[in-house]
């Protein structure tokens, strides 16, 4: 808190007239400029800057959102968690210094926690390239990052949106491979889209997935799963229609063409197997869970998973039981034979006496 004393302001009982004074506008601009200069000086001392950001970091981000005139200066002072920053935050300048050769974008992702966001399947391709990703764990972080647009010459994009596609970084050979996969799985993607209906906007072959079978990504102007949850909670608190507000927020489903599960689905579709529809829905629901979305039909999801697990168990159990029974029978036979042999040996070794003859 502070106070500004000025002899240039006219004395007036009307606060409305005073607020329109040009002198007040000049004072306001100078205060902002002097404050920014002070913040920049604090940023030169690492320990002081940590203390400053822990106390006022959120307000710096609010300034990034609301103060367009000073947005660039404030953005250089804002700190965000990242996949490479450990427990400390990072500034955009520090991020830029760590960017990999050939990296053309600055990436960020939102999540309920840093660990949850960092484990999202949409980051697999970026991790493989060694790219650092900023992590927004608070609504203020996400709103601030959404409004950045560009930092210097780099576009700032949400890694969980289609705008983060790395098509501009692919070689000619990689582009050709992508087109071949798209044609090869054309029938499969069309089938999955029909099976899911309005739950997804599009079903596409992914270049960003390396180990997961599927993932959900938002279109360029879509809301992240965390922002959707936040908006639903706000609508519910205000007594509004949360489902109406979130209508039309379907995501795109991306499939990994090299994953065994997707290859199995392709085979099921090609053979016209009835299991293909349930398999498609499971891939979608797995993508929803791993990408941070809520499964709209938890009971159905559980039922499909149990059905899949149960089908495998029924085939495996008789075989295992039969093997166990066979092993038990073999052990019993071996024990009986051993006991008989031992009894025979004992009988043979026993001397022949009148008593033995009487027993016989």
What are the residue ranges of the model-derived segments?
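Conserved GHKL (Bergerat-fold) ATPase module
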Residues: 1-360
